[in-house]
Structures are given as structure tokens and as C-alpha cells.
Design a protein with these regions (language model features):
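Catalytic cores of secreted/periplasmic lytic hydrolases that degrade extracellular macromolecules
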Residues: 41, 145-148
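Stable alpha-helical elements in mature extracytoplasmic
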Residues: 58-65, 74-78, 102, 106-109, ...
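Functional surface patches built around histidine and acidic residues
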Residues: 69, 90-92, 139
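Secretory-pathway/luminal and periplasmic proteins that interact with or process carbohydrate-rich
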Residues: 86-93, 143-145
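Substrate-binding/active-site groove segments that recognize
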Residues: 96-116
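A short, structured beta-strand-centered segment in the mid-to-C-terminal lobe
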Residues: 119-129
Length: 148
């Protein structure tokens, strides 16, 4: 296969992914702050750090969440894993496995995890949701393959 053929095949997929990424973040906040939300809802006042301000702020959010939910290995382990999984890029995506976000949640598990840990309807590409869900999961079950 030539480079030109590969480029022609990947362009429509890249265009579609770009369109989805532009639409999803706007819609991903819809159910997050609804009044009367369930007990698992994470209030915005918990680690009120705007991750969109760059990698420094993503790391700061990870440190805050790791301290809030006391994860095994603390913030240093949480940072090392995020660095390995996505290099702290909220939009990281593995097209082979479908893993997305800072901590690379598989797309078919993300909706259930997000719902269970207070981020119903949020995108895995939202760093706040991805980090908070991960820290709560790790607090409950430790680091390791989650498998569902």
C-alpha cells in the first residue's frame, strides 16, 4: 500500500473523528450538574481546577483528585500512569483498542463507569471526568486491569 492510498483512507476517518470531538465536549456537560443528582455526583467544588489551561493544570487536577480519594501509591503513581497512558493529553485516543482520554478508558466501559462515579453523559475526552472517575475507581479497587 502506498502512502497516498493510506492517506486517502485515513482522511475520512480523521474528518469524522474531528467532527465528533467538536460536538461531544459541548454535549458532555449536559447531565453533570443537574440538581437532585445522585449521591455519586462529584460537585464542581471538589478540585476546582480548569484542566483546559494546559498540562500543568491536568497534573494539578490529578494531584488534587489522588489526594482527595487517597489512591494507592498517591499522586506520584497516578501521575506516572497518566504519563504512560496518554502523556497527559485529554484527547489521546487509541484507534486499535478504542481507549480514550487521560487514563485510556475503553469506549464500551466508559459510559457505565462515568455513570457509576458521578459523570453520567460526560465524554472520556473530558480530563476532569476521566481523572475523577479513575481516582474513584482506584480508591475502591486499586490499580490494575479493571476489565469492566
Amino acid at each position: 500500500m502506498t502512502f497516498r492510498t493510506l492517506r486517502r483512507r485515513r482522511f475520512p476517518a480523521a474528518l469524522a473523528l474531528t467532527a465528533v470531538l467538536l460536538i461531544v465536549p459541548a454535549a458532555s456537560h449536559a447531565g453533570a450538574a443537574a440538581p437532585g443528582a445522585g449521591y455519586s455526583e462529584v460537585p464542581r467544588k471538589v478540585c476546582p481546577i480548569d484542566w483546559r489551561d494546559g498540562t500543568f493544570h491536568v497534573k494539578k487536577l490529578i494531584r488534587c483528585a489522588a489526594a482527595r480519594w487517597t489512591v494507592p501509591g498517591g499522586a506520584s503513581k497516578a501521575l506516572a500512569i497518566a504519563n504512560r497512558e496518554s502523556n497527559f493529553h485529554p484527547r489521546a485516543y487509541n484507534s486499535y483498542s478504542g481507549a480514550a482520554g487521560i487514563y485510556q478508558h475503553l469506549r464500551h466501559y466508559w459510559p457505565g463507569r462515568a455513570r457509576a462515579y458521578g459523570f453520567r453523559g460526560w465524554s472520556a475526552f473530558n480530563a476532569r471526568a476521566n481523572i475523577m472517575v479513575t481516582m474513584r475507581m482506584v480508591h475502591r479497587g486499586g490499580w490494575g486491569p479493571w476489565g469492566g
